Amino acid sequence: MSRHEHTADRGDVSSCVLKVMPGAADLVIHAEQAPDRLFTARFESPQPAVSVAGGTVRVRYRYSHLRTRGEVALASTVRWAVELRGGAHKVDADLTDVPLAYFDIDQGANLVTLRVSPLAGWVPVRIGGGASHVTIVRPSTAGARLHVQRGAAHLVFDGQHFGAVGGEVRMESPQAGDAGGYDIHVGAGARHLTVATATRPSG
């Protein structure tokens, strides 16, 4: 199936928001390779509406029984805030080469993988209630602070496995007191949640 392309020039933009709504599905987010582009988005039909205004790139899905597959590439010279509104299903966000201001899924995250970059300072990551099969991978030099509201099942934090944890959960990595990392807040009822560091390639 053919894909239609949306793009915009980067210009002198230094920070921007990507807002996807309602309900991202089968979406890949990664770094843009063309240095003069702010972003490039490609989607199968039915096409979502894509617009740029006031420092925000908006992707608005149309209501349809058909699932729209797509990808969004973000300029690696721009600091991005990513907001997924109305849920997220099968989202692969490889932001290892993209500076991140924050990452926010308001509800219903399912089968989401987020890979993030090295950084200075602390960056918030928020995953709304009812998250399932969510994986967050950071560089080994970056710290992590995890806060889960009212319990979690099948939680893995930096190699530590927990079958079920009742009540509020707070954990932090040994690197959490150093230069920076990721402040991860997850809503109630999380299942199959993994927070890990990236493995070094062999050889």
Each language-model region and where it sits:
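Short secondary-structure capping/junction motifs at helix and strand boundaries
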Residues: 26, 91-92
